[in-house]
Amino acid sequence: QNWPRPQIPP
């Protein structure tokens, strides 16, 4: 299963 990765701030 492919789920979107959590958005990590730069």
UniProtKB/Swiss-Prot annotation:
<comment type="function">
    <text>This peptide both inhibits the activity of the angiotensin-converting enzyme (ACE) and enhances the action of bradykinin by inhibiting the peptidases that inactivate it. It acts as an indirect hypotensive agent. Bradykinin-potentiating peptide 10b-F has much lower activity than the full-length peptide.</text>
</comment>
<keyword id="KW-0964">Secreted</keyword>
<dbReference type="GO" id="GO:0090729">
    <property type="term" value="F:toxin activity"/>
</dbReference>
<keyword id="KW-0483">Metalloprotease inhibitor</keyword>
<keyword id="KW-0873">Pyrrolidone carboxylic acid</keyword>
<keyword id="KW-0646">Protease inhibitor</keyword>
<dbReference type="GO" id="GO:0008217">
    <property type="term" value="P:regulation of blood pressure"/>
</dbReference>
<protein>
    <recommendedName>
        <fullName>Bradykinin-potentiating peptide 10b</fullName>
    </recommendedName>
</protein>
<dbReference type="GO" id="GO:0005576">
    <property type="term" value="C:extracellular region"/>
</dbReference>
<keyword id="KW-0481">Metalloenzyme inhibitor</keyword>
<keyword id="KW-0382">Hypotensive agent</keyword>
<dbReference type="GO" id="GO:0030414">
    <property type="term" value="F:peptidase inhibitor activity"/>
</dbReference>
<comment type="similarity">
    <text>Belongs to the bradykinin-potentiating peptide family.</text>
</comment>
<feature type="modified residue" description="Pyrrolidone carboxylic acid">
    <location>
        <position position="1"/>
    </location>
</feature>
<keyword id="KW-0800">Toxin</keyword>
